Amino acid sequence: MSAAPAYSEDKGGSAGPGEPEYGHDPASGGIFSSDYKRHDDLKEMLDTNKDSLKLEAMKRIVAMIARGKNASDLFPAVVKNVACKNIEVKKLVYVYLVRYAEEQQDLALLSISTFQRGLKDPNQLIRASALRVLSSIRVPIIVPIMMLAIKEAASDMSPYVRKTAAHAIPKLYSLDSDQKDQLIEVIEKLLADKTTLVAGSVVMAFEEVCPERIDLIHKNYRKLCNLLIDVEEWGQVVIISMLTRYARTQFLSPTQNESLLEENAEKAFYGSEEDEAKGAGSEETAAAAAPSRKPYVMDPDHRLLLRNTKPLLQSRSAAVVMAVAQLYFHLAPKAEVGVIAKALVRLLRSHSEVQYVVLQNVATMSIKRRGMFEPYLKSFYIRSTDPTQIKILKLEVLTNLANETNIPTVLREFQTYIRSMDKDFVAATIQAIGRCATNIGRVRDTCLNGLVQLLSNRDELVVAESVVVIKKLLQMQPAQHGEIIKHLAKLTDNIQVPMARASILWLIGEYCEHVPRIAPDVLRKMAKSFTAEEDIVKLQVINLAAKLYLTNSKQTKLLTQYVLSLAKYDQNYDIRDRARFTRQLIVPSEQGGALSRHAKKLFLAPKPAPVLESSFKDRDHFQLGSLSHLLNAKATGYQELPDWPEEAPDPSVRNVEVPEWTKCSNREKRKEKEKPFYSDSEGESGPTESADSDPESESESDSKSSSESGSGESSSESDNEDQDEDEEKGRGSESEQSEEDGKRKTKKKVPERKGEASSSDEGSDSSSSSSESEMTSESEEEQLEPASWSRKTPPSSKSAPATKEISLLDLEDFTPPSVQPVSPPAIVSTSLAADLEGLTLTDSTLVPSLLSPVSGVGRQELLHRVAGEGLAVDYTFSRQPFSGDPHMVSVHIHFSNSSDTPIKGLHVGTPKLPAGISIQEFPEIESLAPGESATAVMGINFCDSTQAANFQLCTQTRQFYVSIQPPVGELMAPVFMSENEFKKEQGKLMGMNEITEKLMLPDTCRSDHIVVQKVTATANLGRVPCGTSDEYRFAGRTLTGGSLVLLTLDARPAGAAQLTVNSEKMVIGTMLVKDVIQALTQ
Amino acid sequence: MLDNGFPLATESNILKELIKPPTILRTVVNTITGSTNVGDQLPTGQLSVVPWRRTGVKYTNNEAYFDVIEEIDAIIDKSGSTITAEIQGVIDACVKLTGMPDLTLSFMNPRLLDDVSFHPCVRFKRWESERILSFIPPDGNFRLLSYHVSAQNLVAIPVYVKHNISFRDSSSLGRFEITVGPKQTMGKTIEGVTVTSQMPKGVLNMSLTPSQGTHTFDPVTKMLSWDVGKINPQKLPSLKGTMSLQAGASKPDENPTINLQFKIQQLAISGLKVNRLDMYGEKYKPF
């Protein structure tokens, strides 16, 4: 370190020439002899006022601690400095304190007050480090203080302090486990924390203190899943392994109904991996379709976990990748486990330590799920530079992966390995060949021949290993291999490795009837060298002799007796024992005989062939990636991975009261969609309308009310309408009260509403077609959105001037053919995509209220009935994409004939249009009977300007000049984007493109949904989810140019607010700001 | 930095904030003023939402460098055919930009990248949807991503080795000859070539003459290494000579493996091309 020279020079200066030892590096030894005088120096230095001297002394003391020297007698001198101003000295004092406080408890108490002061420091970093050191001091007396400090820190403003509190929990727990109950309370509180900083640490504390309290996780499960990607890497590892355990207890096994799945649901939901909601949808359909068969349905939360962990396979941290891999291995359905293979193979490129761990896990996985790694076979080929352990593990994997099709390449590879210089590796290769031969019958002969060839290898180790493997192979089909046994018999002269010799002898003894001539000869040779053999060989010689005696006693009787006599006087008691035992069995004596009659059965019983198995075979009962798995033994603190439950525990425990999770709403949305009832009457039955009554329901002149929600009632004109209004109002408030469980309400209320509709009170009827109601920023409303939106067109086109009494059914006929309902699938998919985006958003506090736009501004008059001689025409902006041309604004034109004569041939006459503006005319309306009304849709491309489109409205008899001028808010269409995208886009549209205006929000519009409602009523923008509650974001694109319009409303307390619009089109931006401010401040 | 065994801060930017990395200038300053490398400010980086980036970064010259480094990893059998070859690449960056820049890096052919792993700063969703790397970079040097090029693409190995290593049973001498030559280098020179080979135990010593570069043979570890340097296509480097084998012992039956390492500058073997780099969020022009 560069500090070293500077430091020694320093010291030389301060210590003076009289004590040259001072100049030594503190770590270099020598100066820390157990001389107390030295410590006196240190004490002196600590007592001075100079920080540099104190620092010097502390450095040396810490160096002493690091070297294992006792520095405890300095405790009083050091503790005094805990209040030192110098941060560096302070840090070193802390290090000292943590080390010695336990030994000098009384004195350590002196320092506590300093920490207590530190805990109140305004700086969060100091608060945190005070807590960190305080909790590291292992003094039982201060347990209550620590407990208090942790509790306080757990509710600290700063997430960093809360994180430190989480770290302190296991420390306190290890100091005093009686505090468990209190600590669990703190953990529970911290688990509810929504910041990523805390999540990892608190789960770590949870795992240390109360891993069995799985019930604490329920409420936080979805949050943890959603936060996971943003937690720091170490936290991710802890959370993932905890969630693995959690999922094992809470969800059903995805593999339990494999066979059913294959035929039934496989396509339905495995195909839609990336699209959770879709998956959930098909789950339900599947469930509905075949309730009797009860196919496995994956819990959406289970799916959520799998989906949210998947991106982490791309993490740079090997630990995270491994954690996700084990999660997938333990939790994912068979078809999906494969995704982890690629990432694991990538880890093989890492350091050899990482490789070792990964390969261990791959070896276990490859036994169970061989197919997963087959495409990556070549990645497990051995490199000459690999260390031996890695080579052997790779061999293991290669052997596991070998099958009928790839065995030729694998064997060719093995052949190369045999010539390696690493003998351990060669031996492992031979064993691997043996395993391949037993597993794959087709290549057994090839392998056997290859192994026999190896017998002529010069290296003894290779030969010995081959013999052992051949022995095992021969046991499987001995009859055909007499030749090989003979060959082996010849080898006994050369092979010296005891294990190999023993194997050969055993083989000859076992199959002596196949080699009747050679066997006695081998015994003769062995008898000669018996005394020089190793024990294991001697035992086999006795064995061989006994077997030969039983089969061929004529030739071998003498030899056997000779061998047995030799063995009788062997040094090894095992051999003496065996000899005595064998002799009693085979040589019939006078009295015994009961056993010797069965000796043949005893010795030459048919023996089952050995099974060559991977040593990783049953390792998978340990959780992969754990230390226990690595060691193949249970390590302390290992948490057994529980088995899947038979019955899934209640999934509703994970529901959080506040319906802020898009996912659950998604699910509900699906449900709603499926019910024909809803899609039929959705438009008419929105029970959730707010106080705002729909302008469309009101008389034509009431067109202004649209922009100011809630004022519709007061401005309504006709009396009977007013009554309706009141009714509406009452109901509206009712539904407001019950916003929370709006969905249930929906069901209940629909019948009522229906009844009303049939009582031909079309005022209320058409009013309910309002989708304004859906702005109440409730996610539940949001679910209804796509459904209702897709159905919106007919009702809104149906809505007729209030004065006319026309029943709904009749209106249906009038709906012009050009009015096409917006194609539902497209919308659904966009909003779905948006929902899914919402899911992965960083901040969990988001209410993912991606409100789709509301059906436009209220009616504007195009032609007054006086001027139009009985023909009254007005228009609304429907805010639906115009079917013909996406750049066009679709305008609904409502005609009503209040004259006495039918009006014929309504069409658009030669328009006189400014440059760029174009019109898609509505089809001619042939006739409009007196008292009737009709609606037509036309598209106008305003070319992103607010210039009026002038055109003629012609009847058979007359021509009227009319003009439509769009409010700027109608020139755009909502865009769905995530908060991040929004911020990014906003970043691109700075400077000139940004228009900011300050405003005061009146008291009436401080609540969330009113603001949102007002903004979306003014401009056709989509809400963007936003992390902070006081900020509202909206996004849209202009229809013609497609340029982004981003609107941010930053509401501060006390009504002040700032409105920012970012758009390339500055004119539009300016006008929009003006309009929105007007709408908000009115 | 650990707290009770649990990693607390491992992000290098935070650690650098705590203890400044030594530089020559700082050493000099420290010697004179007696200060140390220990940061005197509180490490605020830990509190940030982007823990990998320090706040308040300032540079007079704003610059960003990206290095695409690719490695071919291949096993080639003795007849010269490729057993397996894969390309592994990394993009290392050195970003020295003021403030909080938001960068996007796009590739001409992102499909090439088969398996990628990112620095946590990279927004995964952008990559999933648009195959664009969008990130707020850490300050200084860091590894932006590492990738794997799918094994399906055939990898053209840019060099070849001709070898002739023979041990004779009777004599105590063996012949040894290797020649290294270029193959499909797209006009680039091959540099930094080193050849290493682990010889069998039976080899006592080797007397070799290289046509260029230097070679060493360690009789204890039996490791032959030959530092070749650049390959001149006109005059291929070769290493010829004899090996003296243990007298009386039979010829070794292992095949020595030859490890060859080389570098080619300015060439991404997978053909990966960077399309463009854009910066958002800051007003200055970085390049």
From Swiss-Prot, chain A:
Residues 1-30, 272-295, 666-802 are annotated as: Disordered. Residues 279-295, 704-715, 757-774 have a biased composition (Low complexity). The modification Phosphoserine is found at residues 272, 282. One of its GO terms (biological process) is anterograde axonal transport. Residues 666-677 have a biased composition (Basic and acidic residues). InterPro entries: AP3_beta (IPR026740), AP3B1/2_C (IPR056314), AP3B_C (IPR029390), AP_beta (IPR026739), ARM-like (IPR011989), ARM-type_fold (IPR016024), Clathrin/coatomer_adapt-like_N (IPR002553), Clathrin_app_Ig-like_sf (IPR013041). GO terms for cellular component: AP-3 adaptor complex; axon cytoplasm; clathrin-coated vesicle membrane; early endosome; Golgi apparatus; intracellular vesicle; presynapse. Residues 790-800 have a biased composition (Polar residues). It is found in: Cytoplasmic vesicle, Clathrin-coated vesicle membrane; Golgi apparatus. Its main location: membrane. Residues 691-700, 716-727, 775-784 have a biased composition (Acidic residues). Keywords: Cytoplasmic vesicle, Epilepsy, Golgi apparatus, Membrane, Phosphoprotein, Protein transport, Transport. Isoform 1 expression is specific to nervous system. Expressed in nerve terminal and cell body, and is associated with nerve-terminal vesicles. Expression seen in Purkinje cells, cortical neurons, neuroectodermal tumors and graded in cerebral cortex (deeper layers exhibit stronger expression). Isoform 2 is expressed at high levels in brain and testis. It is a peripheral membrane protein. The keyword Transport applies. Belongs to the adaptor complexes large subunit family. PANTHER family: ADAPTOR COMPLEX SUBUNIT BETA FAMILY MEMBER. It is linked to Developmental and epileptic encephalopathy 48: A form of epileptic encephalopathy, a heterogeneous group of severe early-onset epilepsies characterized by refractory seizures, neurodevelopmental impairment, and poor prognosis. Development is normal prior to seizure onset, after which cognitive and motor delays become apparent. DEE48 is an autosomal recessive form characterized by onset of seizures in the first year of life. Affected individuals manifest global developmental delay, intellectual disability, absent speech, and poor, if any, motor development. AP-3 associates with the BLOC-1 complex. Adaptor protein complex 3 (AP-3) is a heterotetramer composed of two large adaptins (delta-type subunit AP3D1 and beta-type subunit AP3B1 or AP3B2), a medium adaptin (mu-type subunit AP3M1 or AP3M2) and a small adaptin (sigma-type subunit APS1 or AP3S2). This is AP-3 complex subunit beta-2. It comes from Homo sapiens (Human).
